Regions:
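Residue-level marker of beta-strand positions
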Residues: 39-40, 54, 80, 123
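Mid-domain Rossmann-like dinucleotide-binding core that forms the NAD(H)/NADP(H) cofactor-binding site
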Residues: 95-174
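Short SAM/SAH-binding signature in class I
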Residues: 187-191
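Local cysteine-cluster metal-coordination motifs and their immediate loop/turn environment
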Residues: 1, 47-65
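Glycine-rich beta-strand-centered segment in the early N-terminal region that forms part
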Residues: 5-53, 92-94
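A structural motif shared across PLP-dependent enzymes of the aminotransferase-like
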Residues: 51-54, 72-84
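Short amphipathic alpha-helix with an adjacent loop that forms part of the alpha/beta core around
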Residues: 175-186
């Protein structure tokens, strides 16, 4: 939404937004080997140069010249998009489009919980209950018992309660810091 409203400092404009994309292959180039017309695919949202040190080490996600579709280059909110075969991942028929677009936020959630070394007795604070925050909540609730979710939308906070948040905070209408301290018995969160 920050890109749409022009408040995302990382974005370049003008810009067609949309970075979590599922599509159907309509046409392929001469060098395409594995994609077929009609394949349903999810698109890697980041592009990398393939030449810099991180790329040469297989870490294109931290490329020195990384560009994100929908942020730095045009994204998926259009009828057609040309994408290199290497950025397309064929989806099984058993996976719905709605579930497929959540693959990227879910992988970030898994990596976040893993890197945080989240433990059962941690007090986790998730700020934001959008796609990424909700994905973190789903993964973290399998590990951690004490999860606080903060957002400014009551409907998202209600969904968070049903998805495993022990506490929720509406950061627009409640004293955020006081609520965190109340829910953590004065300690504050151990992971956020």
């Amino acid at each position: 939404m920050g890109i749409y409203h022009g408040t995302n400092a990382a974005a370049t404009y003008p810009r067609i937004i949309g970075h979590e994309m599922v599509g159907v292959v309509e046409e392929t180039g001469a060098d395409v080997k594995n994609l077929k017309i009609g394949n349903r695919v999810i698109i890697n949202q980041v592009t990398s140069c393939g030449e810099c040190y991180p790329c040469r080490k297989g870490r294109g996600n931290v490329c020195d010249h990384l560009k994100v579709r929908g942020v730095h280059i045009d994204g998926g909110y259009r009828e057609y998009i040309a994408v290199p075969e290497s950025d397309c991942y064929i989806l099984p028929d058993s996976l719905s489009d709605e579930d497929a677009v959540m693959i990227e936020p879910t992988t970030i959630a898994i990596q976040s919980c893993t890197r945080a070394e989240l433990e059962k007795d941690d007090m986790l604070l998730i700020y934001g209950a959008g796609a990424l925050g909700s994905s973190i909540l789903k993964i973290a609730s399998k590990i951690c018992d004490h999860i606080i979710v903060a957002d400014i939308m009551d409907d998202k906070l209600e969904e968070a309660k049903h998805a495993g948040a022990k506490y929720t905070i509406n950061a627009m209408t409640e004293d955020f810091q006081a609520k965190v301290l109340e829910y953590t018995h004065g300690r504050g969160s151990t992971v956020s």
